[in-house]
């Protein structure tokens, strides 16, 4: 498979792009974790930014819901943010202080689900702003990314508890220990094979877990690659960012890994998403947005 990578510099210096998603308008929307803005980039590379009302909010992960609204986590301010396509913001304060919300996804019930890193909880917010929090067995588990599984449950990584968690829309929780000790799971996604896939930022592996809890692990070729985010691909594969390896990588459902080097050194890639046209876009904390095009 041949690819090309283009990179677009964000207008504002030291904006710190982190999360990224495809909007209903076809553009890419991303969080500027350091710049305290939500950014938008179109297919030609034109970038606009929208300041977040709360100062130093620490915007991290971002999604676009079925109606087109953008939802994002505010790690520093313990809020969930909502933004319309025309730049109107609403912010919802979490009941728990210093919750550090991080991962976010839309649930099968139409609500938005998110993780609370600092207090070991999974949160749920309705489109009208009503918030419910579910406590995990270990309050120090550091839940990170979260995704919707094809079984209708929400699956999440527990970075400091070395487990993959599963929570139903009723709040019922199950946990599955990862074979590699202290693996540091972070990104998680529902794969094209129906299983749940996740990255191990310390274990340097990609993991796969079935709904029965059976886990397989695949070693990343580059040492200390520090994989971060992962998403399903278009050809029975998944793609993930290597924060330490400075690469965008592909893993097939059979576990074969291919790595592609980012042109900019120390780009610090984090969030990653696919556009409908098949291009893959990713956020680089070095103040750029990357675009990977598959040639063959």
UniProtKB/Swiss-Prot annotation:
Annotated InterPro entries: Streptogrm_lyase, Vgb, WD40/YVTN_repeat-like_dom_sf
MF terms (GO), sorted A to Z: carbon-oxygen lyase activity; magnesium ion binding
Biological process, per Gene Ontology: antibiotic catabolic process; response to antibiotic
Binding positions (substrate): 228
Keyword hit for Lyase: yes
Enzyme class at the top of the EC tree: lyase
Pfam family, one: Vgb_lyase
Entry keywords, A to Z: Antibiotic resistance, Lyase, Magnesium, Metal-binding
The enzyme's E.C. designation: 4.2.99.-
Cofactor(s) listed in the protein's UniProt record: Mg(2+)
Coiled-coil regions listed in the entry: none
Residues where Mg(2+) binds: 268, 285
Catalytic residues in the record: 270
Role this protein plays: Inactivates the type B streptogramin antibiotics by linearizing the lactone ring at the ester linkage, generating a free phenylglycine carboxylate and converting the threonyl moiety into 2-amino-butenoic acid.
Quaternary context: Monomer.
Family in the record: Belongs to the Vgb family.
The name this protein goes by in its record: Virginiamycin B lyase
Organism listed in the record: Bacillus mycoides (strain KBAB4)
Native organism taxonomy: Bacteria, Bacillati, Bacillota, Bacilli, Bacillales
Gene this protein is translated from: vgb
